[in-house]
Each structure stands twice: as C-alpha cells, then as structure tokens.
Design a protein with these regions (language model features):
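A short, amphipathic beta-strand motif
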Residues: 291-303, 329-331, 369-370
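Extended, loop-rich substrate-binding clefts of extracytoplasmic carbohydrate-active enzymes
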Residues: 77-129, 139-141
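Short amphipathic beta-strand segments in non-cytosolic proteins
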Residues: 308-323
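Short, surface-exposed beta-strand/beta-hairpin micro-motifs centered on an aromatic residue
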Residues: 321-322, 326-335
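A short, solvent-exposed beta-strand micro-motif common in secreted/extracellular proteins
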Residues: 329, 339-349
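N-terminal secretory signal peptides
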Residues: 1-9, 18-27
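Beta-strand-rich ligand-recognition modules
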Residues: 440, 446-455, 463-554
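Structured interaction patches on ligand/partner-binding surfaces of diverse proteins
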Residues: 349-368, 372-375
Length: 554
C-alpha cells in the first residue's frame, strides 16, 4: 500500500450489478461519427470512439495504456497498465477498421487477445482466447487511477492500514476487515462491477463466463480499491478456491463501459448482448449466434418451492446455466456451444439431479419434464433433529452472511464458540458456519431421545460445502467415538478467510450404534464435533470446514 496521507472518504457509490435490478442507460454515448477512427502515435494505437472515449493500446505488448473519458484519464496506477494477468510480453499487435468497428488484435505465443470499438459508443469490447497453459491468464484487470472512486466498501482497503493475513487481508483501526476478495457475490449474482461518482461511471460488464470455471456459484475477487488505485476484473481462470480444471478457448466479449453516472445498459449484459457486428472480424475461436444451440426444459418436478433452482450445463470445454421458473421449473439456456454436456439441477447450491444433453448449433434441444427423485434431496429424509437446511450453503448458520465479505476475526462476527441445544429454537443461528481446528473445534450439541429412539442405531449426517487444509469432522456421541473420515476432494487454497464457502459439497455419514445413546430419556446426549487434519497452521488458517446441514435420522 502507498504511504499517502489518509483523508476523509468522498461520497462515491459502490456498484456491483445484478441483472435483475440494474436499470439500463443508453448503450451509446452522444455520437460524433466524424471523429471515429484511429491513429498511430508511434508507441500506441489511439482509438477515438466518436463518443466521449479515447483509448490507447500499446503496439509492443497489447496493454491498454490510456482510457480518457470526457477529457479525464482513468487508466493506470503505480506505473502499471490494464492487461491480461500482470501483462503480456512482447506481442504482435495489429489494428483494422471495418465500417463502424475498429479491432485491435494482440498475439502473445498461443494467447490471442482483442479490443474492439464501435462508432458512437463509450465502450471497449474485449475478448481473450487462451489456448493452453503456456501463458498464464487468470484475469483481465482494468487498473484505475487513485482518488477517482474513493470508497470504504468491503473490497476497498484504502483506509485499512494493518495487514492481518497474507498480503491481501487488512484491518481498519476499528478492526473491521477489508480485502479484494470480499465481493459478497457469486457469478450468477452480478452482471457488472464498477464504481460511480454520480456523474461518471466506470464498469466492467462480465462475459457469459463460458470458458471460465467453477460454475454459477463460484466466488472470487471482482474489484479492489487501495490508496494506490483501483482494479476491476474479468475472471478468466482464477485458481483461488477453484473446483474445476481450467477451460480453454475464447472468452468474451466482456466490456469496459463508461456512463454518465448511471449503471451500464442492460443491452451489454451476458445473455442479452448481441454481437452480430463481430461475426466477420476474424476473431480466433469466435462462434456466432447461429452456430450455437439452446437447451429448454418444460419443467422440473420434485422441487421444494421454498428454494430457487438452477440448471447448469458443463463439459471440459464450456459451462452455462439458467434459472428454473418458480411456478413450474421451466428453464432455458441459450447461446450454448455444440457438444455433449452434463446437466445438473441445483436446489440452492446443492446438486439434486444430474443427466446429460447434447446440443447442436442452430437448434433448440427440448427436454421433457425432469423428475427429481425424492431420495436425491437429503431434506426429504425423516430426521429426529436437523440443524441448517440442505441447500448446499451455510445460510442461516452463525456468521454465514458476514463471511462472504469479512474475515473471521472481524469484530462484527459473533463469537465462534458456544454450544447448541436441540429444542431451543435457535439451533441453526447458534451453530457456527465454520469450525476450525485451532478456533472452535470441540463444539457440543445437546439433545434428548425418547426410549424408542434410544433403543435403535441411527445415522448422523454432516453436510459440508468446502474445507481448508483437509479439515473434516470427527464425532463423539457420549462415549462413542467415530473413525476419522477420509477427506473429500476440496480446493487446496484459502477459502474460509477470503469470502468463499464454495467448494465441493460433501456429506459425511456416521453409523451410531444403539449402545452409544443414554437410556435415561431425561438426560441430554452430547454430540461433540472436532475438526481433524494433519495440515493447516494456526487460528483461522488451521484446518477448517464450512457447514451445509447436519441431522440425526429417524
């Protein structure tokens, strides 16, 4: 962080866009078509969009070196430009104009990258085609000058001088935590990220993420703000807390969009944006709308109508998703590349159905009603008691919501310790969303059984959403101790401290014999949950896990 003097926060609006709520502004700025075109200043190609935006791209490495909107420079901080990853090396950079479109093409090894401008628009359309792992390409970052969009949101650490974890989690003087990781949002939740002063808005409108990884519920950094400047990100393949292998091919367009203070036009949003004007530009890997297919389902039965359902399509080459209609489960997933896909139906974030579907370009594949078997939803099993809800998330557990935008040490968090009594009415709210080996392992759950219940063996289930350092639950019931379960496959990076519970949902089952229960029905049985692992360090970086639900089956 810079050593610049602290100053009062100027009023700026924090904007992370939802397709469901964003009000669109005009797609194009005030056109001055006569000025649309480009020049060569020797080091850069200089593009005037014919509206209020002029941008420059380096002829040497394809960096975006300037973004001037209404006469103000927005690009760059700390001597750095906007680019793929931390910048490409010496590249082949060319420019062409075709009518009302200018295309800049960048080739660096096997990676191809593109910037496009349209006459009269204050937008830069961007594509990135990563062919293999020879070029690291986890993100595109738009770097923004310091002081233009000052704010004190969870992903802004301008006013958080104390480093508390790694080099990317910070604390303010009051203890509140800040980090670039604290976006609060899943991919499915947002269409754009950015800031506005009220008179100028700068955003990155995300692509459809067909070549990204992690699915609709993936969480990652989306932007940051520090004393040095700010950054807006399009995630290409971010390895932090990642559950899938990297996909290759063309991702985009994602759009760098300027407005007069409002939110970006919904015409730029993923699923809405049309780019027929790019069909003949020769972009490597580009597949026009006519070469794509659609998957539609007439309905989904067996749903719990208290939850939202999402239908995902995925293979090694691409990923897509769409929301199921609340009334009948109808869904439509358009713009799909041809191929065979695994189709997954999610209740919340919990997979409750999988199938397969083949997509052909230019056609719609219509599926008959999908029936979710009752046994696929763990919530349908009869239980003596249950804590949490089987939806694939820690929603409702203590501190669950806060942990998507704060560190566990944040003073706003309730105590991570404390035991739970079944029948108290506050079981879920009292149960911590996360348990770490070095913080609150050994949590106790008290419950009574009837004589008939105590006379039989029962299955205890613990559902988790991710784990850090192979943390997994070992249970003790009164004097009976379970075996240590094998760790399921989970991301190897930080998760619980960087705003994400999203890993691989897994259910541990424990067969508790009848001999484990107390025979005196007036006494409480005691369930102890310990996190075990041979990995991790201390405190919040000790081995840990995040909970979905736990129950004792009848």
């Amino acid at each position: 962080m810079s050593g610049s003097a602290r100053r009062a926060v100027r009023r700026r609006t924090f904007v992370l866009g939802s397709a469901a709520t964003a009000a669109g502004v005009a797609l194009s700025g005030t056109a001055r078509a006569a000025s649309f075109g480009y020049t060569d200043d020797g080091s850069n190609y200089v593009v005037d969009t014919g509206a209020n935006l002029v941008f420059k791209v380096s002829k040497t490495n394809g960096d975006l070196t300037s973004l001037i909107y209404r006469g103000t420079e927005y690009q760059g901080y700390d001597g750095k430009n906007s680019h793929v990853e931390s910048g490409l090396g010496t590249s082949t950079v060319t420019i062409t104009q075709s009518g009302s479109t200018i295309l800049i093409s960048v080739t660096y090894g096997t990676l191809k990258h593109y910037y496009a401008a349209r006459s009269g628009e204050n937008n830069v359309y961007v594509w990135t085609n990563k062919a293999d792992t020879s070029v690291s390409a986890t993100r595109y970052i738009v770097r923004v000058k310091a002081g233009l969009f000052l704010n004190d949101e969870p992903d802004s650490y301008t006013y958080a001088p104390t480093t508390i974890e790694a080099a990317d989690v910070f604390a303010k003087s009051d203890g509140q935590t800040r980090s670039k990781h604290y976006s609060k949002l899943r991919v499915i939740d947002y269409s754009y990220v950015g800031w506005t002063t009220g008179s100028v808005g700068l955003y990155v409108v995300r692509s459809n993420h067909e070549k990204a990884s992690g699915g609709p519920f993936y969480r990652s950094l989306l932007r940051h703000q520090s004393a040095d400047g700010g950054g807006l990100y399009e995630i290409l393949y971010y390895g932090e807390n990642q559950t899938e292998a990297q996909r290759f091919g063309l991702q985009g367009p994602y759009v760098i969009a300027f407005t007069d203070g409002g939110t970006p036009s919904s015409a730029l949003f993923p699923g809405t944006l049309t780019t027929s004007w790019a069909d003949s530009l020769g972009i490597s890997g580009y597949v026009a709308a006519g070469g794509r297919g659609r998957v539609a389902g007439v309905g989904i039965s067996g749903r719990d109508t208290a939850y939202a359902y999402t239908v995902g399509l995925a293979n090694s080459a691409a990923q897509y998703w769409g929301s199921a209609r609340a009334s009948d489960g109808y869904f439509s997933v358009p713009g799909v590349l041809p191929g065979s896909y695994t189709l997954t139906v999610f209740k919340g974030e919990l997979a409750v159905y999988t199938g397969s579907v083949t997509v052909t370009g230019g056609t719609t594949t219509t599926l008959n009603s999908i029936a979710i078997p009752s046994s696929n939803d763990p919530a349908n099993a009869g239980a003596i008691w249950r804590i949490g809800a089987w939806d694939g998330t820690p929603s409702g557990f203590k501190n669950a919501a806060l942990m998507t935008y704060a560190h566990p040490s944040d003073p706003r968090a309730a105590a991570w310790t404390g035991n739970v009594v079944i029948g108290s009415g506050s079981e879920t709210a009292s149960f911590p969303a996360y348990i770490w080996q070095g913080v609150n392992s050994g949590l106790l759950v008290y419950f009574r059984l009837t004589a008939a219940q105590a006379a039989a063996a029962h299955t205890l289930r613990i559902g988790v959403t991710t784990a850090y350092a192979n943390g997994r639950p070992r249970v003790t019931v009164n004097s009976w101790v379970s075996a240590i379960p094998s760790p399921p496959t989970q991301p190897s990076t930080r998760s619980l401290t960087v705003g994400s519970y999203r890993g691989n949902n897994h259910t541990f089952t424990y067969s508790v014999p009848a001999s484990a229960w107390l025979t005196d029905t007036s006494q409480y049985n005691v369930l102890r949950i310990d996190v075990v692992s041979g990995s991790g360090t201390t405190a919040y970086l000790s081995a840990g896990t995040s909970f979905d639900a736990l129950d004792l089956l009848a």
